[in-house]
Amino acid sequence: MTQSVCILGVTGSIGQSTLKVLAQHPDKYSIYAITAHSRIQELVEICKQFKPKRVVVPDEHIDQLRQLLLQAGLADIDILSGTTGLVSVAQDEAVDVVMAAIVGAAGLLPTLAAVKAGKRVLLANKEALVMSGNIMMQAARDHQALLLPVDSEHNAIFQSLPSNYLTLENTGQPQLGVSRILLTASGGPFLDYPLEQLSEVTPQQACKHPNWSMGQKISVDSATLMNKGLELIEACHLFSISEHFVTVVVHPQSIIHSMVQYIDGSTLAQMGNPDMCTPIAHALAWPDRLQTHVPALDLFTHTHLDFREPDTNKFPALNLARQAMRAGGLSPCILNAANEIAVDAFLKLQIKFTVIPEVIEHVLNHVQNDTAVNIEQVLETDMIARQIAHQYVNQIRG
């Protein structure tokens, strides 16, 4: 019997990698629902190949999609729209596994819906967990959902931890002999750029990641090291550990995906070629394994591995994320909202690269932090933070 899969964000890089893995195992998995924000023609081609039962797009693309599916002889596919549609497919009784791969805050509600429906949730949308934090984790416990990390770093940590670590209560302290998590970072495309040159870098340069193929937003986050900051927050929630016990290590080759240190002096590392199909396959099949097209790591071609401390003077976003996690409450939500607006402004050439952390710091200082009680409060704070960020960006533009 095959497992039924819903892919939230099927046309993005994670969605595409998920399709590659699923296509190798039609005897184990079938695709029940897929969603996309744009790239409608690409979505139709996916429908032709995988024959999903349900598809979700924004309201403005419904007519176009319906016409294209009709022409393709796929008129029986159920078309839904908007956030309501996303939530509907994420919690659908027919779905066993949800790949949460929508980028940014837009993925929060459908991801939370999947968790509350007790699904096996493959978490690629780090922003959803950064925003909701304990609300998401408590929902997973209450509804017995299996929340498995897909980010290569968190998947590596998961593989390097004792097998029952995700079921532990959150004490903030390392448990089961763990002493510290080492979260690796490639350092991004500007790792060796002088500080004085960063103000002139372009979106095109920022989106050229040295090791990974990713979308624009996460590529810019990687360039500012905010991606590592968001991952630090995600790691604290997933693995029930205070930020004090998470060390970021710059590792330019992206061969070691993260490490866990133990009290006996051991350090366990997960290594592999930088290909997202590996963590996706691991999360899909855990505690089993799936074969993928990814070649095994050839250690003889990697003559050395480099490690260094992050330069937080050149990349202040990492410390902003750490401070937000330390502050707790809604601070990570505020950080994420400000970052999304700042990155979008940079991609639209409205602000310089070095202004991104400036926008984030301004918003953190001007939006009231509080304890996150419910998801409505999270969404309201997200909206306010975005408004403040927009205002500051417009002020800078003059």
Swiss-Prot record:
Spell out the Pfam families in the cross-references. DXP_redisom_C (PF08436), DXP_reductoisom (PF02670), DXPR_C (PF13288)
The residues the record assigns to binding Mn(2+) are D151, E153, E231
- Give the Gene Ontology MF terms in alphabetical order: 1-deoxy-D-xylulose-5-phosphate reductoisomerase activity; manganese ion binding; NADPH binding
Amino-acid positions noted as binding NADPH in the UniProt annotation, renumbered to this chain = T11, G12, S13, I14, N125, E127, G215
According to UniProt, this protein's pathway is: Isoprenoid biosynthesis; isopentenyl diphosphate biosynthesis via DXP pathway; isopentenyl diphosphate from 1-deoxy-D-xylulose 5-phosphate: step 1/6
Q: Which UniProt keywords apply?
A: Isoprene biosynthesis, Manganese, Metal-binding, NADP, Oxidoreductase
The domain of life is Bacteria
Q: Which reaction does it catalyse?
A: 2-C-methyl-D-erythritol 4-phosphate + NADP(+) = 1-deoxy-D-xylulose 5-phosphate + NADPH + H(+)
Gene3D superfamilies listed in its UniProt record:
1.10.1740.10, NAD(P)-binding Rossmann-like Domain
Tell me the cofactors it needs: Mg(2+); Mn(2+)
Instruction: Report the coiled-coil segments.
Output: none
Residues bound to 1-deoxy-D-xylulose 5-phosphate are K126, S152, E153, S186, H209, S222, N227, K228, E231
Concerning its family, UniProt says:
Belongs to the DXR family.
Entries under HAMAP family matching the protein: DXP_reductoisom (MF_00183)
Q: What is this protein called?
A: 1-deoxy-D-xylulose 5-phosphate reductoisomerase
